[in-house]
């Protein structure tokens, strides 16, 4: 029986390590007083808050970037001057501009394409910012731009069901898989949408709590896991 399969990938902390980009940049400006994981979750929290305000039209995108940086540093007891904040943003962007797609991910995409699985990206964030990362990763080689679903463009953010339904309206399949690191957005959203979630934990480990969910620690585990789930 030939089922039509769609495999949807998150971007940040899935296709590259955003936590590493942040941590590398942070260490240029201060010595971390707390462990990397806690520091990153603080940054995530501050990023989400700033992005919410930007999405609601309360602040500009560049203000949201300044705010997430200054609040993260404040949380660890460091006051950054506005010059330092700008310097951090530039250093962060420079580090981000050097991200590459690992061979392992390329193999995943090649296998999916070989099996005629429809693959796509579903990511929360500002359109240009997310697109630049996808260009940097050279993603259009495997996933056409029409299948880059970015929350600002589709006007729906994971975990809202609208984001997942938007993908379904563009890609018809019998079974949808969501590959991502974030329990709140990727996993919860996928479960609500009746998709099959796979939590990707290589770069960012989040406790899935009582959610039943398959887990992949490395890209190479993803394809066999999809096969396994399909044959359950």
Residue locations for each model-derived region?
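Asp-based, Mg2+/Mn2+-dependent phosphohydrolase catalytic module
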Residues: 1-5, 110, 126-232
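Active-site neighborhood of HAD-like aspartate-dependent phosphohydrolases
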Residues: 1-45, 75
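Acidic active-site catalytic centers that drive phospho-/nucleotidyl reactions
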Residues: 10-12, 17, 124, 181, ...
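A structural signal for well-ordered alpha-helical segments within the folded catalytic domains
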Residues: 20, 24, 66-67, 161, ...
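An amphipathic alpha-helix signature
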Residues: 23-27, 62-70, 127, 131
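Short, surface-exposed acidic
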Residues: 32-43, 75-88, 141-145
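A metal-dependent, Asp-based hydrolase signature
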Residues: 49-90
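Substrate-recognition element of Asp-dependent hydrolases with the DxDx(T/V) motif
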Residues: 87-88, 95-100, 105-138, 147-151
